């Protein structure tokens, strides 16, 4: 998209150099060969735009990139699929000279755009505004109908190419999973010379455990105990993995951006806690692929969706603790802070009280919201907004 943007704004093809280091054309290059290759193709008396995908495959790539920055009139775009690209040892070379942009799977609104749907608003007979979604043939849908598809298939852009077909989606997600696991974890660790992360079966079991426990308080010890006690490990395995080994595998999953970890924050004490955190999976379609598309745990699924939507909107997100109660998310940036509860439904009185109680205990004046998957009438109660999940996700 950036290359297209440049061309649409008058940048000529000879100014753009694109290299994908998964291609056999480039994957055996050294840093010195990369430097010479680019220099030989520079435009005369014009700025160059260099695009390097998966450049971490090149040993000492950072030396070449730093030399381009010093020696050439150019803009440099480096893309990769894991945090290893910007690990501390490499980021040091580029500190203060680069901007990191994290790219997530599609939001619900982007999912609709990719599939050719349009969101329109009209006045509701009961007051306020009502959203409807239309396809290219003009057929209309309730937002919840399309949200159900998003919760099933997830936000990987490739889903738009195969359509909302379960078998085709499974094939696509299987390819994504295999690529992430084989290339971005096992192969990367092998190149690093690490010997801890070598077992694809153990890696898959840990991934499935975390996918099945999104939004639950989870410790490394609990992962290890569950794998052993429920006999989920390969019976031919010699010995049980240590907690240290499990920690290494989980760390690799976080580094590959398959899972994100969220920490707890004491609202009254105003400090992060060293108690159990939670994990969320980067794409809910990937979770459904791993667990067989079984329809369960909707509450944690929509919690997962809300967490990543908050990240897309530029918030730092933590779990809130107020006395002995928990707030699902504290979302903060330089301008604002929001306390957010997420629930499948607000229609039952006991659920309503459970979700509202922690927010009532917070004495500051920041915005407090409950996002409900099933909410008959969005209202404000005790200064707390209660809104539908679809409205939150479609709010721009």
Task: Cite the ranges covered by each PLM segment.
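A cross-kingdom feature that marks ATP-driven nucleic-acid transaction machinery
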Residues: 1-11, 245-396
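Short glycine-rich substrate-engagement loop in P-loop NTPases that contacts/grips substrate
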Residues: 17-46
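Conserved P-loop NTPase "ATPase switch" module shared by AAA+ and STAND
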Residues: 43-61
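Structural recognition of the conserved hydrophobic beta-strand(s) that form the central parallel beta-sheet
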Residues: 75-81, 102
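Interdomain hinge/linker elements that couple catalytic modules in large macromolecular machines
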Residues: 118-302, 308, 316
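Short regulatory helix/loop adjacent to the ATP-binding pocket of P-loop NTPases
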Residues: 84-100, 112-117
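Loop/turn-to-beta-strand initiation segments
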Residues: 46-49, 72-77
């Amino acid at each position: 998209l950036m290359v297209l943007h440049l061309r649409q704004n008058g940048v000529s093809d000879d100014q753009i150099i694109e290299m994908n280091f998964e291609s056999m054309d480039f994957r055996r290059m050294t840093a010195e060969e990369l430097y010479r290759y680019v220099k030989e193709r520079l435009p005369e008396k014009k700025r160059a735009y260099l695009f390097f995908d998966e450049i971490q495959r090149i040993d000492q790539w950072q030396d070449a990139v730093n030399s381009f920055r010093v020696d050439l009139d150019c803009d440099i775009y480096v893309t990769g699929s894991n945090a290893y690209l910007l690990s501390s040892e490499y980021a040091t070379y580029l500190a203060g000279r680069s901007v990191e942009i994290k790219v997530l799977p599609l939001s619900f609104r982007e999912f609709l755009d990719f599939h050719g749907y349009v969101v329109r608003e009209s006045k509701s007979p009961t007051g306020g505004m009502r959203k409807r979604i239309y396809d290219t043939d003009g057929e209309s849908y309730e937002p919840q109908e399309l949200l159900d598809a998003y919760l099933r298939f997830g936000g990987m852009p490739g889903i738009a190419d195969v359509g909302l077909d379960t078998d085709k989606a499974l094939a696509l997600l299987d390819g994504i999973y295999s690529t992430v696991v084989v290339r971005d974890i096992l192969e990367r660790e092998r190149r690093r010379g690490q010997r801890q992360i070598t077992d694809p079966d153990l890696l898959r079991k840990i991934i499935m455990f975390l996918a099945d426990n999104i939004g639950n308080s989870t410790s490394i010890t609990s992962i290890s105990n569950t794998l052993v006690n429920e006999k989920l490990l390969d019976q031919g395995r010699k010995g049980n993995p240590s907690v240290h080994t499990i920690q290494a595998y989980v760390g690799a999953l976080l580094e590959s951006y398959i899972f994100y970890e969220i920490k707890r924050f004491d609202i009254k004490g105003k400090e992060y806690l060293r108690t159990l955190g939670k994990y969320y999976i980067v794409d809910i379609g990937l979770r459904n692929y791993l667990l067989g598309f079984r329809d369960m745990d909707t509450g944690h699924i929509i919690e997962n969706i809300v967490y990543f939507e908050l990240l897309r909107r530029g918030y730092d997100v933590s779990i809130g603790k107020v006395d002995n109660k928990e707030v699902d998310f504290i979302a903060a940036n330089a301008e604002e802070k929001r306390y957010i509860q997420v629930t499948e439904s607000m229609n039952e009185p006991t659920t309503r009280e459970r979700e509202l109680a922690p927010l009532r205990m917070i004495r500051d004046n920041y915005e407090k919201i409950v996002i409900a998957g099933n909410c008959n009438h969005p209202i404000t109660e005790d200064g707390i907004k209660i809104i539908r999940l679809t409205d939150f996700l479609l709010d721009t």
